[in-house]
């Protein structure tokens, strides 16, 4: 089964708001305790060219786990994000190919 990926790109009014939300994300995701059957990864990255933007990458090995996390995030994360009212774009896809280069 291919990996399921969700990419969420947010643009806040300024870098301070973005960093405040990143701190909230770090706290909320550390509290996640859903019972998942496979590996699930959350990565959060701030744009190096524009600190008012960040991207969250969610990677699931199973549809069931993705749904568990999606339900939790809808209740726990989205209401907090929506208070900041950033411009937001979300893409959900299945991984078609992966290329890795180098030893490490």
Q: Which stretches of residues belong to each language-model region?
A:
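Active-site-flanking beta-strand signature of metal-NTP-handling nucleotidyl enzymes
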Residues: 4-11, 55
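Hydrophobic alpha-helical core bundles mediating ligand binding, dimerization, or RNAP-core interactions
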Residues: 8-9, 25, 29
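A short beta-turn/loop motif at secondary-structure boundaries
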Residues: 45-51
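Short, surface-exposed ligand-recognition loops at beta-strand->loop->(often short) alpha-helix junctions
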Residues: 11-24
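An amphipathic, aromatic/His-enriched active-site/gating alpha helix that lines ligand/cofactor pockets
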Residues: 27-40, 49, 59-94
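Short, low-order "capping/linker" segments at domain edges
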Residues: 97-104
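Non-catalytic surface loops within mature trypsin-like serine protease
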Residues: 12-14, 60-62, 97
